[in-house]
Regions:
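Alpha-helical scaffold segments
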Residues: 1-193
Length: 193
């Protein structure tokens, strides 16, 4: 297997890499074949000659941490964004993507349910965050993820209210929030506008 792994890792044959990326995995009941295939997919995922569309496909569909970790450092923001949106991400991995250099990757990671509340709070406090992502974060615990932990969702919504990039529409919504802390923060921001 090591020779095949190295061959795939260093291959410049995009067509062969693409075919391997799209090949169905063996049945999980054949553990040896399944493990071998997922290990080899890691080599394909990490090869820059694998077409971007195939790397995005792997990033969106693979539940395997070794492959997702490899793709999370891909040179293409499109691939990293796909990893950030993968519902099978480990929370530490999607958390790392909330700090990505690409605003689109960060925004996608913050919308992933696997993202920790600490990372969501940091995103809500980020003065460079876009208003669409702030709209999402400002809806946590209300319209979005209504069963979210109340205290944590409230902290995030309050941080959104204090963010200079929050949209006027979201600020108006937060001024009517069920939490008095969120209401006060939003009303203070509205008064300063």
């Amino acid at each position: 297997m090591t020779a095949t792994y190295e061959r795939l890792r260093h291959s410049t044959d995009s067509a062969a890499l693409s075919e391997f990326a799209r090949r169905p995995l063996p049945d999980r009941s054949d553990q040896a074949a399944f493990s071998r295939a997922t290990a080899l997919l890691e080599a394909v995922a990490g090869n820059a000659h694998t077409p971007v569309g195939d790397r995005v496909f792997l990033a969106e569909t693979m539940p395997f941490p070794n492959i997702l970790v490899k793709l999370s450092t891909d040179e293409s923001p499109e691939v990293r964004k796909a990893v950030a949106g993968n519902a099978d991400d480990k929370n530490w991995l999607v958390g790392r993507l909330t700090k990505d250099e690409s605003p689109e990757v960060r925004a996608t990671a913050l919308r992933n349910k696997r993202t920790s509340w600490k990372m969501r709070l940091e995103g809500a406090e980020d003065s460079t965050m876009d208003s669409d992502t702030l709209d999402f974060l400002g809806s946590l615990g209300t319209q979005v993820e209504p069963d979210a932990p109340v205290v944590l969702a409230t902290m995030v919504r309050r941080a959104v209210a204090l963010n200079p990039n929050v949209s006027d529409r979201m600020l108006q919504q937060l001024a009517q929030d069920a939490s008095s802390d969120v209401q006060k923060a939003a009303q203070r921001q509205l008064a300063e506008k």
